[in-house]
Amino acid sequence: MSRGKRYNGSEHKLNIKKVIAVIIAFLVIIMFVAVFIKLMQPKAETTEKKVAMAYYSAFTNNKWGIIDSSGNTVITPSYDEMVVVPNKDKAVFIVTYDVDYTNGTYKTKAVNEKNEQLFSTYDQVEAIQNYDQQNNIWYEKSCLRVKKDNKYGLIDLSGKVLLDCNYESIEPLIGISNSLITTKDGKKGLVSSTGSVIIDNEYADIKSLTNEYENGYIVK
């Protein structure tokens, strides 16, 4: 009579260990695949809200300086004359100094947010001021008037030359933005604030038809 195989307890425990090991290995594989899939998925773009910085003239203790839109002092008030901000979005400021009220003379220069001089190759750098019928004052935002060897030209706020210093004067067409009257050899002409010639220097006088430059000009 044959006898049945006797139960081997150690072999049973070994089989259980193998099953557990297989399960653990399977779970590790699943975790690895899940991590891999997550890494392969495109990351959601995070958008940061950026607040545009703006600059303004500031008057404190009878001195002029510059502050930013957060109220921080950019240039400590130290100037007797107002520091002009042609374009509030650009850190280019015009300061007036060595003013002689008796003789009506003064000097101007451009500085940056560190109060360092810009465009120093020119004898004078000015913002171009204009006004309307209600005496509201504004400045051309995209250009500056520069002087060299007693002649005037235009640059943009990065220093790029828009018009060479070949003109006896460059003045705004009063009440009209983006329109500047140039004088060369005693004749009037018209350019835009980007330096584009609109009317050649061939006339005694130039006036606007309306308060919108698109509506045309009268030349004499």
Regions found by a protein language model. Name each.
Residues 2-220:
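Residue-level detector of conserved, function-critical positions
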